[in-house]
Amino acid sequence: MDVFKQSEVWFVIGSQNLYGPKTLQQVMDNAHHVVNSLNSEAGLPVKLVLKPLVTTPDEITALCREANYDTACIGVMTWLHTFSPAKMWIGGLSILHKPLLQFHTQFNAQIPWETMDMDFMNLNQTAHGGREFGFIGARMRQQHSVITGHWQDKEAHQRISQWMRVAAAKQENQQLKVARFGDNMREVAVTEGDKVAAQIQFGYSVNAYGIGDLVTVVDAVSKGEIDALVEEYEATYRLTDAVQLHGNKRENLLDAARIELGMKRFLEQGGFKAFTTNFENLYGLKQLPGLAVQRLMQQGYGFGGEGDWKTAALLRILKVMGTGLKGGTSFMEDYTYNFQPGNDLVVGSHMLEVCPSIAKEEKPLLDVQHLGIGGKADPARLIFSTPAGPALNASLIDMGNRFRLLVNVVDTVEQPHPLPKLPVARAIWQAQPSLATAAEAWIIAGGAHHTVFSQAIGVDELRLYAEMHGIEFLLIDNDTTLPAFKNEIRWNEVYYHLNR
């Protein structure tokens, strides 16, 4: 999955005509140098495209209008090389719908102490030109990001890359379609929510389909297609005796392959990039989709169990953000605790549906075992553990008057003991700042039992994602204390009530 190849970020230089053609030409020459260097040396995930210099309100407005309607453009990055009076930007910024990044940089890294004259000062005015631009953004109450640093600085490169990934995720939101196979798990609260409000806030659409619609496609899968996919299984995974040729669960594996092929075909035909299932709505399917869901997540699809469309959409978005990065991202659920002084642990898992992108093993184990929930035949699943390292759990919840993105930073650990009787994939982590504080803060904030677990994406990207969409962001990490966390929630209640 590479969602970045067809995308671009427009690099825009603002100035004014009073500087004269010689200075403006030097500005553009410097801009060409900066853009070419960033594209070739900074490791950015999205290509920068230098646009013509803008020096008048009409030019700025025309450029912003063009950016809105260019599907390849996922955002606009500005550099105020000289001074660009910000009233010129009001018309353009008032109609700009794409993410905006102000790169507060200058061409020279250091001051040329012995040679600096007024011509140099006239040309290099980022220090105050950027402040003028920043004022109009603040005055218009417009969300825009600011990155300060020299254009050759590695930290600046990293932050620009993060912004690009989040901008691409926002673009994905605008075209994302989520399919719900069946409805919500009966009587469950947190997986419900306002789908119309979500489409207004984020852009993605959520629609339900009867399980019979899926079954029709599943039943149409040919034997040849199934055999070919099972050969892929045999080459990719370690198969238990039960699912190998002539094994007593081989037929269950063939059924799982049929479900995967049918489910993927349904999603492709409808243009869906995220989906949900529900073990209470399985009529016509021989088993709960487990292996199918795991493999589709690894291919970049978002997923949520029990009809959880918010988690499905969020998972797809984090998959997009994390394209090409080390580490995986998966649907997850806090399942059980290990209460032990100095070694409190959380076991995260689900009935079946954990993405192999977070697998420690090069070849996960493929098996079929009994599942007491759902009342169907024993389902196929991949079984694996997760490597140690930094990670996070993210939950998107509907608070009625706003959406809340809740994030807990965790430290994934090596599985301390074998789990010979647990036939599901799992991750084990220590929650920051402690299990007690993290769990209490999560519960107080109304965090869902379903999360998106990621070892690829960090807090900065998710905070920026929340800012771009105007939603609440709450963080639980090593700096969290419960009194301060509760106060933040109280203050946010007032802010979002007044900001409706």
From Swiss-Prot:
Cofactor binding description: Binds 1 Mn(2+) ion per subunit.
Example of a GO biological process term: L-arabinose catabolic process to xylulose 5-phosphate
Pathway: Carbohydrate degradation; L-arabinose degradation via L-ribulose; D-xylulose 5-phosphate from L-arabinose (bacterial route): step 1/3
Keywords, ordered alphabetically: Arabinose catabolism, Carbohydrate metabolism, Isomerase, Manganese, Metal-binding
Source organism of this protein record: Yersinia enterocolitica serotype O:8 / biotype 1B (strain NCTC 13174 / 8081)
Annotated disulfide bonds: none
Gene: araA
One GO molecular-function entry: manganese ion binding
InterPro entries: Ara_Isoase_C, AraA_central, AraA_N, AraA_N_sf, Fuc/Ara_isomerase_C, Fucose_isomerase_N/cen_sf, Lara_isomerase
Presence of the UniProt keyword Isomerase in the record: yes
Catalytic activity of the protein: beta-L-arabinopyranose = L-ribulose
Protein name per the record: L-arabinose isomerase
Task performed by this protein: Catalyzes the conversion of L-arabinose to L-ribulose.
EC number, as in UniProt: 5.3.1.4
Gene3D superfamilies in UniProt: 3.40.50.10940
Similarity comment: family membership: Belongs to the arabinose isomerase family.
Signal sequence, renumbered to the chain: none
